Amino acid sequence: MDMPPAEHSAPRRDFIKTLGAGAALAVLPALPLASGNARAQGTNIVMRTIPRSGESIPAIGLGTYLTFDVLPGQPREHIREVIRRFWDGGGRVIDTSPLYGTGEISVGDFATAFGITDRMFITNKIWSTGEFLGDESHARRSLEQSMQRLWRDRIDVMQVHSLVNVDQILPVLQNWKREGRIRFAGVTHHELPYFGALAQYVERNQVDFVQVHYSIQTRLAEERILPAALANGIAVQVNMPFEKARLFKLVEGRPLPDFARELGIANWAQYFLKWVISHPAITCAIPATSNPDHQAENIGALRGPLPDAEMRKRMLRHMESIPGFATLHETPPYPGKNYNGIIRKAQAQRAAAAK
């Protein structure tokens, strides 16, 4: 992969102190990856260029919201296997956040165990307010915690999470860039009512990256955000390409259309992902999963041809012919999924207290 040498690894300074005794997890011994993993980055996979640096990254990354969040002491073997298959399949971009429960910890632990810490392209987030307007102490502590959890002394992309306190935090990120603590600064959101606000930072060329909700069903980003990103040379990460698993529920039991074979599409995950990453503005999609078999399906979207503009229209028309597609957002998220990490535990406790 065409990336400059990275020097990210550092000792986990005060690691146990940072996590708290109750959340501390053992660092795993080194584990070998499949012998062919280095070849997975060959020219046969779909790569995208980061406009601000010219380096290339694979167009399919890995998200970690809910899927990597497990309670301390619970089995994590499935997460280890997800990362292994992701890496062996050619993936390099992993997205996480301090808000994702134990997600950062799992990424850091297994990346270290596999010996890939220095080679990952990590995108992370800041959700910070401070003790008073202009106070950046919370942001600094968040960055330091993320570095310790991920075992990095530099984060590739740091983004203002959901535009929280964005006008105070974005200048902080720009300072961190100058100091070499991060490489790129960005903003994120996934809720459609905030897309207008998100678009302003892209249109004003104030960021290097933008992370946005975009899928074959949710295409609002095409109106302002994606055109502005193309015009200003801003990298675009896509969250929720599967609509929180709703798309899979919609097509459950349905065969792929015959024309999918023209693109080498073997499953619905690749259908949805190839549609997303074929947009010229998209740099990388970050589907999340806790299922190793699903990860193998996802990373397969890096191979084979991508749809052109006419094929994208055909793929969309096919989805529009399926009952329930237009009202997909009205259905419950994560159908059939059972996530039991710190986040879900806290949400359940809050709901119980409100009764």
Positions of the model-derived regions?
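N-terminal secretory signal peptides
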Residues: 1-11
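N-terminal twin-arginine translocation
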Residues: 9-17, 25-42
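C-terminal segment of N-terminal export signals and the immediately downstream linker at the start
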Residues: 30-61, 74
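Conserved, mostly hydrophobic/aromatic
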Residues: 50, 62, 94, 107, ...
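Structured C-terminal cap/extension of enzyme domains
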Residues: 50, 224-355
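Acidic (Asp/Glu)-rich catalytic clusters
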Residues: 51-54, 108-118, 147-151, 177, ...
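Glycine-rich, proline-tolerant flexible connector loops at the mouths of alpha/beta enzymes
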Residues: 95-111
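Glycine/proline-rich, positively charged
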Residues: 129-220, 224, 230-237
